[in-house]
A protein has these predicted regions:
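Soluble non-cytosolic domains of exported or imported proteins
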Residues: 49-60, 106, 110, 146-159
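Sec-dependent bacterial lipoprotein signal peptides
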Residues: 1-22
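Short secondary-structure transition/capping segments
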Residues: 2-5, 116-130, 162-170
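A structural signal for short, well-ordered beta-strand segments
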Residues: 42, 86, 113-117, 133, ...
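A general structural signal for short secondary-structure boundary/capping elements
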Residues: 87-92, 130-135, 159-167
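Generic marker of residues within folded, mature protein domains
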Residues: 12, 19, 32, 76, ...
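Surface-exposed short loop/turn segments
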Residues: 68-73, 78-128, 138-148
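A structural "domain/chain start" motif
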Residues: 21-64, 71, 76, 123, ...
Length: 173
């Protein structure tokens, strides 16, 4: 059966449109600065806020997320290819919802942890990533603010750790 030229042209046009949609898709890690499999050493994060206990929670969460993600190797003992450090610059809380019968009493609030992430090659000191990330979580205020913030800290650190490892693996968009 011989097809008319118009239907053949329409077929090729449709095929070209479908194939061009995949042209920008990339397989694997997209960050050329840090290749997969490199060993990342997590250094201490500096806490520039008055909120205590942030450094330990953030460091532990980033180490755990690096192991879970498995794109990079977690270096221990100073043998890493890349040194990851950071500076926790802000800890903010803002009201999200209030008690139904008392508009002055907060029921839920959002906590934000703003951190400047710095990844540098250990051998040369060349900065690979210098980026500000914000971890967020929402917390229901139960009895008192201090216990609610203690419960929110692991969630906040985990959100920041997920964003940090995604930045290392996928690069800046």
């Amino acid at each position: 059966m011989i097809r008319p030229p118009a239907s053949r042209s329409a077929f090729f046009l449709a095929a070209a449109v479908m194939v061009s949609g995949c042209a920008s898709y990339r397989l694997g890690p997209v960050n050329p600065a840090i290749s997969a499999g490199q060993a990342i050493e997590v250094g201490l994060f500096q806490n520039a806020t008055p909120q205590p206990g942030l450094t330990e929670s953030v460091n532990a969460s980033i180490r755990r997320e690096l192991q879970r993600d498995a794109t990079f190797e977690l270096a221990t003992g100073g043998d890493g290819d890349v040194l990851l450090t950071g500076n926790i610059t802000a800890y903010r809380r803002s009201a999200v919802s209030f008690q139904p019968r008392d508009i002055l009493s907060v029921r839920d609030f959002e906590v934000e942890l703003v951190t400047r992430i710095l990844a540098a090659e250990k051998a040369t000191g060349k900065v690979l990533i210098d980026h500000e990330l914000t971890g967020r979580t929402t917390v229901r205020l139960g009895g008192d603010l201090a216990s609610a913030e203690r419960q929110a800290l692991p969630l906040l650190a985990n959100d920041l750790a997920r964003k940090t490892v995604a930045l290392l693996a996928e690069g800046e968009w």
